[in-house]
Amino acid sequence: MAFIAKSFYDLSAISLDGEKVDFNTFRGRAVLIENVASLUGTTTRDFTQLNELQCRFPRRLVVLGFPCNQFGHQENCQNEEILNSLKYVRPGGGYQPTFTLVQKCEVNGQNEHPVFAYLKDKLPYPHDDPFSLMTDPKFIIWSPVCRSDVAWNFEKFLIGPEGEPFRRYSRTFPTINIEPDIKRLLKVAI
């Protein structure tokens, strides 16, 4: 089992360009974390909506995308290829993320990223689908398997401005529909 941090602000990640992303710098802002993949059926929808949310709350929301290849091998690019895949393939059309993408990682199993170990400990299942599990066992390519595992690409975790994990959303929950919860956390009129 992975080490679980005591606080969200103790965590960090490495961006696609190799810079350390220290979560301590996010104090006072809401944070949306989503495991992403550039070759998934909902890539265009979810990446576009992540950009939209980041643009709507440019100073009060931090959006972090964590590329992961554990679900149907739908992020098979190397770190240095991911941005070009997004720009030219899917979503394509010159797409550029307005949020931070970190280096490819695992979100489940023995080698899960510490961010996901922490978030799954605090939010063990999506609030909109508490029974969500991987539906086809042939896609489970990690060990050990846990009830709190991320079930597929584009699960989302929303963290409040005080660093408290607030809510987890399933892959079927549209990213843009998180906006009312972001406003609630930021105390913005809905």
UniProtKB/Swiss-Prot annotation:
Its EC number is 1.11.1.9, 1.11.1.12. It comes from the Eukaryota. GO terms for cellular component: cytosol. GO terms for biological process: response to oxidative stress. One of its GO terms (molecular function) is phospholipid-hydroperoxide glutathione peroxidase activity. Disulfide bonds: none annotated. The active site is at residue 40. Pfam families: GSHPx. It catalyses: 2 glutathione + H2O2 = glutathione disulfide + 2 H2O; a hydroperoxy polyunsaturated fatty acid + 2 glutathione = a hydroxy polyunsaturated fatty acid + glutathione disulfide + H2O; tert-butyl hydroperoxide + 2 glutathione = tert-butanol + glutathione disulfide + H2O; cumene hydroperoxide + 2 glutathione = 2-phenylpropan-2-ol + glutathione disulfide + H2O. InterPro entries: Glutathione_peroxidase, GPX_AS, GPX_CS, Thioredoxin-like_sf. It is found in: Cytoplasm, Cytosol. PROSITE patterns: GLUTATHIONE_PEROXID_1 (PS00460), GLUTATHIONE_PEROXID_2 (PS00763), GLUTATHIONE_PEROXID_3 (PS51355). Keywords: Cytoplasm, Oxidoreductase, Peroxidase, Selenocysteine. The keyword DNA-binding does not apply. Belongs to the glutathione peroxidase family. Homotetramer. Catalyzes the reduction of hydroperoxides in a glutathione-dependent manner thus regulating cellular redox homeostasis. Can reduce small soluble hydroperoxides such as H2O2, cumene hydroperoxide and tert-butyl hydroperoxide, as well as several fatty acid-derived hydroperoxides. Cannot reduce phosphatidycholine hydroperoxide. This is Glutathione peroxidase 2.
